[in-house]
């Protein structure tokens, strides 16, 4: 069956079917191959992506800017000072105006409602580059990486250790839709959003996967195929950083913890990493680590998303 995602917003991966997610991953793989062999793929020739950044980023800005260029389009960088939002213009009006100039909008925001409002009022596709609730592009790059390294997603044990944040949400959603056995281990009080837990359980029931929430990292990583972690204090949580370090230290991914995983496990992190906090050097720099493959795959996964929703290519 041919799948078209033309005109779709990409706000949260729960909005997509398994077949649609597999289409994005297949397209990402194709983009990576074309890039490697030097095959032109300017499917967005003459199109413009507005890139709104409420918060700074290394990987998101570079990967989207390079990606839209490789697809033949142009990326227009807009920070908070470039827009009239601070002077009282609403997100609704901003979305309507931008839609008259550009062919797609990518937004990296603090509050997930902002990207939802952009999508509500824009007449062009809106892509969530990161919000406090969801990080869909990261999860797509993550599962592209897992497919490359393991050859499958169905039935793999994918363990997230740490804070039940936006990265955990998207990893849970996509993994359970794609048939993985997803385990999340957090300190008590730092679990993922209950709504996302419910989605993960429902997705797993439909896909043949499973979902489990634990508070013991050793139990969680037993026989893991994938171990994933993220920073303990996200941007905007700096005031809590010291308290979080104390609470999360038992959840550090170190050489003792990973001994409980399968010998050929892969270690994942969305970066930037706080070495010596959520992960030790001997893990992130080990042969099991694929963190820089993940970072590269942000480029290919996001190119797939842009090509599918802005260019209307069908796979």
UniProtKB/Swiss-Prot annotation:
UniProt GO BP: arginine biosynthetic process via ornithine; citrulline biosynthetic process; L-arginine biosynthetic process
PROSITE patterns: CARBAMOYLTRANSFERASE
Enzyme nomenclature, EC number: 2.1.3.3
Main location (coarse class): cytoplasm
Binding site for carbamoyl phosphate: 57-60, 84, 108, 135-138, 270-271, 298
Reaction(s) catalysed (UniProt annotation): carbamoyl phosphate + L-ornithine = L-citrulline + phosphate + H(+)
Source organism, top-level taxon: Archaea
Pfam families: OTCace, OTCace_N
Assigned keywords, A-Z: Amino-acid biosynthesis, Arginine biosynthesis, Cytoplasm, Transferase
Pathway: Amino-acid biosynthesis; L-arginine biosynthesis; L-arginine from L-ornithine and carbamoyl phosphate: step 1/3
Key word Metal-binding present: no
Family statement drawn from the similarity comment of this UniProt entry: Belongs to the aspartate/ornithine carbamoyltransferase superfamily. OTCase family.
Name under which the protein is recorded: Ornithine carbamoyltransferase
Gene label: argF
């Amino acid at each position: 069956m041919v799948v078209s995602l033309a005109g779709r917003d990409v706000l949260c991966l729960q909005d997509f079917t398994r077949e649609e997610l597999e289409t994005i991953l297949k397209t990402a793989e194709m983009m990576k191959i074309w890039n490697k062999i030097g095959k032109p793929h300017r499917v967005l020739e003459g199109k413009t992506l507005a890139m709104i950044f409420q918060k700074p980023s290394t990987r998101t800005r570079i990967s989207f800017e390079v990606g839209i260029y490789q697809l033949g389009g142009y990326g227009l960088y807009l920070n908070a000072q470039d827009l009239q939002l601070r002077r009282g213009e609403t997100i609704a009006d901003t979305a309507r105006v931008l839609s008259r100039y550009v062919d797609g909008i990518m937004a990296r925001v603090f509050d997930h409602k902002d990207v939802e409002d952009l999508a509500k009022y824009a007449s062009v596709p809106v892509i969530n580059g990161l919000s406090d609730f969801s990080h869909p592009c990261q999860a797509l790059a993550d599962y592209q990486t897992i497919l490359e390294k393991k050859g499958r997603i169905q039935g793999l044990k994918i363990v997230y250790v740490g804070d039940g944040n936006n990265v955990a949400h998207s990893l849970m959603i996509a993994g359970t839709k794609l048939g993985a056995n997803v385990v999340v281990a957090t300190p008590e009080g730092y679990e993922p959003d209950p709504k996302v837990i419910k989605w993960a359980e429902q997705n797993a029931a439909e896909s043949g996967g499973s979902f489990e929430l634990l508070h013991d990292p050793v139990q969680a990583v037993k026989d893991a195929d994938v171990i994933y972690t993220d920073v303990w204090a996200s941007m905007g949580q700096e005031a809590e950083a010291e308290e979080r370090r104390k609470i999360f230290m038992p959840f550090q991914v170190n050489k003792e913890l990973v001994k409980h995983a399968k010998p050929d496990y892969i270690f994942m992190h969305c970066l930037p990493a706080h070495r010596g906090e959520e992960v030790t050097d001997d893990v992130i720099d080990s042969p099991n680590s694929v963190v820089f493959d993940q970072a590269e795959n942000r480029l290919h996964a996001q190119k797939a998303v842009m090509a599918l929703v802005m260019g209307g290519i069908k796979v």
